[in-house]
Amino acid sequence: MSSIVDVIAREILDSRGNPTVECDVWLDSGVMGRAAVPSGASTGEKEALELRDGDARRYLGKGVLKAVEHVNNEICEALIGLDPTDQAYIDQTLLELDGTDNKGSLGANAILAVSVAVAKAAALEVGLPLYRYLGGSGPMSLPVPMMNVINGGAHANNTLDIQEFMIMPVGARSFREALRCGAEIFHTLKKICADKGYSTAVGDEGGFAPNLARNEDAIKLILEATDKAGYVPGEDVLIALDCASSEFYKDGKYHLAGENLALSSEEFTNYLATLCDNYPIISIEDGMSEHDWAGWKLLTDKLGDKVQLVGDDVFVTNPAILAEGIKQGICNSLLVKINQIGSLSETLKAVDLAKRSGYTSVMSHRSGETEDSTIADLAVATNCMQIKTGSLSRSDRMAKYNQLLRIEEELGSAASYPGRAAFYHLK
């Protein structure tokens, strides 16, 4: 087996024009694996540390040259000569080299770029696509996409408090059909927004950001577009929300500024339950703040049997925090963001824990993305059956969808599309 002979990092730009880390891992066979890491806008407080330079003279302080230097020096020295197929040992070496709980010494952006690049190099070395290298042989599920078509909150400059309003094409028979369904609804929604005088500019994740009065109005707009595109809401297409509630949770209340409301945890639970009663909502992400575990318990007890409740900020893809959440009975699903935890091995460990505990997993992008399509392969490799990677515009989002099209084609009869079966944990 080949060994690692060089590790090279560089500073590149993400989809928001901010610096991020890209890494090349070279093997003595001449094979090279490359990975670039994403960056979030609304972030959980317990996420692994993304190392920035803080030099206001470069990129307004957001440069990542320190992280790049860590890769090119001490990380490179530590990995030369190692077997790239021993992912667990590679990642453990990186964690020990960093020596902190939050990867604050080397930077999670440095560690993750190397971790994923090693896996890509190893996959190339053994002649397998990444999803097969990590996921093994046999049948595989393509993920049902959560397509973010209307943006609010931290992702938009409008009055909507809920951050993401998404469509899930559960009635499709294949991923290819699901993507077509989403694209047709997206373009229909664009025309409806234009006809109503709303802006059709798109946000960080490719969705529209109309200046609507109430969160409910965004759902109504999506249902109108779904119907006009020729699909049946509640049958062909379901709605998913990302509340990003930590962003508007202050002093023990959920402040929906756009609707002039300040709600207790119980009141906000009832607010969300009413939306679910009135509309075909199948999934709610970050329905409560990461600091409000009691609120999460209320929400889970009320809706957990019939709605997927996804923990993002509250779990930050951290196996230890997820284990505590499972013990306390909060949420029933894990959002998986590889840069929240900062290594491939820890990401896979979190997904495995969720699966063994009866929780679903949703593979996810970040609002600041690159052309790297690793999460598409990870979604298939882990059979998590759901992916969240933006709207039907912006090439940084389409890179993931297009990779999934290729994977479905490569798998042929070994590929399945789960549709509603992705929510196997609901009654």
UniProtKB/Swiss-Prot annotation:
The record's annotation in InterPro entries points to: Enolase, Enolase-like_C_sf, Enolase-like_N, Enolase_C, Enolase_CS, Enolase_N
Q: List the disulfide bonds.
A: none
GO cellular component terms attached to this protein's record: cell surface; extracellular region; phosphopyruvate hydratase complex
Q: Which UniProt keywords apply?
A: Cytoplasm, Glycolysis, Lyase, Magnesium, Metal-binding, Secreted
What GO biological process terms does the UniProt entry carry, in alphabetical order? glycolytic process
Protein location: Cytoplasm; Secreted; Cell surface
Source organism superkingdom: Bacteria
**Which GO terms fall under molecular function for this chain's record?**
magnesium ion binding; phosphopyruvate hydratase activity
Query: For (2R)-2-phosphoglycerate, which residues are the binding ones?
Result: Q163, K337, R366, S367, K388
The record's free-text note on cofactor binding: Binds a second Mg(2+) ion via substrate during catalysis.
Catalytic positions are E205, K337
Q: Which cofactor does it need?
A: Mg(2+)
Q: Which residues bind Mg(2+)?
A: D242, E285, D312
Major location (coarse): cytoplasm
* Catalytic activity reported: (2R)-2-phosphoglycerate = phosphoenolpyruvate + H2O
Q: SMART domains of this UniProt entry?
A: Enolase_C, Enolase_N
Pathway the protein takes part in? Carbohydrate degradation; glycolysis; pyruvate from D-glyceraldehyde 3-phosphate: step 4/5
NCBIfam families (UniProt xref): eno
Which protein family is named in the record?
Answer: Belongs to the enolase family.
* General function of this protein: Catalyzes the reversible conversion of 2-phosphoglycerate (2-PG) into phosphoenolpyruvate (PEP). It is essential for the degradation of carbohydrates via glycolysis.
In terms of PANTHER family, this protein maps to: ENOLASE
Record-given protein name = Enolase
Q: What is the lineage of its organism?
A: Bacteria, Pseudomonadati, Pseudomonadota, Betaproteobacteria, Neisseriales
